[in-house]
A protein has these predicted regions:
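Acidic catalytic/metal-coordinating carboxylates
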Residues: 38, 64-67
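Two-component/phosphorelay signaling modules centered on CheY-like receiver
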Residues: 17-34
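C-terminal output helix
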Residues: 109-119
């Protein structure tokens, strides 16, 4: 007897309630979801939810996304991270800081595209 496929656990770190709502509505049947609105909540969820993928908004109310990404890399270096931001100029900054991430989406983007990127992570 084959075991059922386990849904991928995705942690969305996003401070905008409307976007969290959109993510939840669009992806709730596709992934096991958890959410954080601040960097502090993100670290809590990183431990509690043990996500397979992290979707990280770079602008948060309590921390800089780069600092949070650095902390994530210290705690979970293997965790795939997709960065989302409205700032077009963030990618070069992240590359210079040598903080690896697996993808970059500039807001606004299509949720379908985000799902395709998550699925492509393997």
């Amino acid at each position: 007897m084959t075991e059922p496929l386990q849904r991928r656990r995705v942690l969305f770190v996003e401070d905008e309630p409307a976007l969290r709502f959109s993510y939840e509505r669009f992806f709730r049947n596709r992934y096991e979801l958890s959410f954080a609105a601040t960097g502090a909540e993100a670290i809590e969820q990183l431990h509690a939810a043990r996500p397979d993928v992290l979707i990280l908004d770079m602008r948060l109310p309590d921390t800089d996304g780069v600092d949070l990404l650095r902390r994530v890399r210290e705690e979970r270096p293997e965790l795939p991270v997709l960065v989302t931001t409205a700032y077009v100029s963030m990618e070069p900054r992240l590359r210079v800081l040598d903080l690896p991430f697996q993808g970059y989406l500039i807001k606004p983007f299509e949720l379908r595209d985000l799902g395709d990127r998550i699925d492509a992570l393997g």
